[in-house]
Amino acid sequence: MSGRNRIHRDIRDSYHDHRDLPPERPFLRGPPLLQPPPPSLLEDLQIQEGEIRRQDAEIRRLLSDNHGLADDRMVLERELVAAKEELHRMNLMISDLRAEQDLQLREFSEKRHKLEGDVRAMESYKKEASQLRGEVQKLDEIKRELSGNVQLLRKDLAKLQSDNKQIPGMRAEVKDLQKELMHARDAIEYEKKEKFELMEQRQTMEKNMVSMAREVEKLRAELATVDSRPWGFGGSYGMNYNNMDGTFRGSYGENDTYLGSSERSQYYSHGSGSQKKPRLDRH
């Protein structure tokens, strides 16, 4: 419509443009005067008519163009409405896509956070796995050591089992040794008692020897006094006539027994206390 107004305004301006025309005469009332137009005016009129025709053709062309533009405008308006509808539909689709994209982004972010947590957990698992590998190696070393110890223990067990088979014999030997020990203890006790008795016998023998030595001294003194006297035949001590040894008749009522000096010493050395008691059999 603005194009149409612009075209009519141009036409109106072209009709009112009198720059090429002669100046108008004052308008007179009454019938017009018939005067022949000058030739220049005719030429101008012809020119103006040609210009009018040209402008009319231009106007028609512009009108046809305006109709075409109006049709194009209607088509464009229809297309604009369709485009607006399509745009609205596209906006709805875009909003749906954005919502879906936001949902996917949230899911992706959640998955990313979950994966990051899994990665951190995997790092901790890796550390734990390395620690467990070290512990497994240590346990393998301990296992090897224990296997060696088990072999040694098995050898010791076999040895102990073989030794256990010898235990009954060893027990019998221990019992025999205990019996021998008891016999030895009894023998030691008997030896102690016997030694004590021997000590008592020795003391009594020493006392007897001292008393006998005194008697011998007395006898020697008596002999000395007897030697100073004259010898008689068949004296009181029964000395033989041809025996110069000075033997005496045996004591304790022995008949026809005479003891010399050596026999007397043996007799006094083997007193009654020197006789040993018979030993008892060991249990």
UniProtKB/Swiss-Prot annotation:
Has no transcriptional activation activity. InterPro entries: FLX/FLX-like. One of its GO terms (cellular component) is nucleus. Residues 8-27 have a biased composition (Basic and acidic residues). Keywords: Coiled coil, Developmental protein, Differentiation, Flowering. The keyword Coiled coil applies. Disruption phenotype: No suppression of FRI activity. Residues 40-229 form a coiled coil. It comes from Arabidopsis thaliana. This is Protein FLX-like 3. Residues 258-275 have a biased composition (Polar residues). Residues 1-37, 252-283 are annotated as: Disordered.
